[in-house]
Regions:
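Membrane-proximal basic amphipathic "stem/tether" segments
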Residues: 1-38
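Short linker/helix segments within small regulatory modules
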Residues: 51-60
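Conserved SAM-binding loop
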Residues: 87-192, 211-218
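Cys/His-rich microdomains that often coordinate metals
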Residues: 45-46, 69-70, 99
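Short alpha-helix
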Residues: 203-227
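Single conserved hydrophobic/aromatic residue that forms the stacking wall/gate
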Residues: 237-247
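Conserved alpha-helix/loop element of class I SAM-dependent methyltransferases that forms part
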Residues: 68-89
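Short cysteine-rich clusters marking metal-coordination/redox-active sites
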Residues: 39-42, 62-66
């Protein structure tokens, strides 16, 4: 099963996987129904979650109902418990919108919700993150999760994120970080998918961020807050994928 998951994730384009997931969801939910694992995003419970991972496959990682991963569920809890996202009037910009959040966010009456991506079939605005067709200071809240590690000129992308965010706005930018490394590792001469997988952990990544990720955000103009939100839950649940947040 784990080997099959790795093959599917590394061969089938993400846009096709997104479409297939919606078709298969009803059958998967029935097959895995139970009460051992609960997805906080929609409250559904299952006998187990699905395995997931491009290289090291994690058991019970992918929710059968929302297709959320650990980081998505953690972000949902952070938004719910630590922000006014669900009750304050906000204009929200969501990059590479995850299926786990899309319909939930669309139904929120308090937010004006725009989704944006260059390739995602779920986005309503098609644009390059390095050249956004958006006005300065036009959004109260920006979500950009696991996008910047795919972008060659991430500093330009960060500048664009800063440009379109209101001065008192909030941005949540998740990326994979190797917390053992002080500096980001990137090598743009590596273009072969297999070599990128070896170097950066995934075939379409162009870098592995180190702890200087936060410095890069500050250089773009952001005031950065580092949040170890997983520590609030480690005594209660097992979270397989460590995540760092800035907002």
């Amino acid at each position: 099963m784990n080997s099959l998951v790795k093959i599917i994730l590394n061969i089938i384009p993400r846009s096709i996987l997104t479409r297939l997931s919606f078709l298969l969801k009803p059958l998967i939910k029935i097959y895995l129904r139970g009460n051992k694992y609960v997805d906080p995003i929609d409250g559904s419970s299952f006998s187990k979650f699905l395995p997931y991972g491009y290289n090291n496959v994690r058991e019970n990682a992918l929710s059968p109902s929302t297709f959320s991963l650990e980081r998505h569920r953690l972000l949902w809890l952070y938004l719910k418990n630590e922000t006014d996202f669900f009750n304050k009037d906000l204009k929200v910009l969501h990059f590479a919108p995850e299926a786990a959040f899309l319909e939930k966010f669309k139904k929120l009456k308090n937010i004006s919700y725009d989704t944006i991506d260059l390739n995602s079939p779920l986005a309503n605005i098609k644009a390059d993150i390095c050249d956004l067709p958006l006005d300065d200071e036009s959004y109260d809240f920006i979500l950009c999760n696991h996008v910047l590690e795919h972008v060659i000129d991430d500093k330009k992308a960060m500048q664009e994120l800063y440009r379109v965010l209101k001065k008192d706005g909030i941005g949540i930018f998740q990326v994979p970080i190797n917390i053992s490394n002080k500096k980001t590792y990137e090598d743009f001469t590596i273009t072969d998918p297999k070599e990128r997988n070896k170097a950066f952990g995934q075939y379409d990544h162009v870098r592995t961020y180190g702890m200087d990720f936060f410095d890069r955000l500050e250089e773009a103009g952001f005031m950065v807050e580092k949040c170890e939100y997983t520590s609030k839950f480690l005594s209660l649940i097992h979270i397989s994928e460590p995540t760092r947040h800035s907002d």
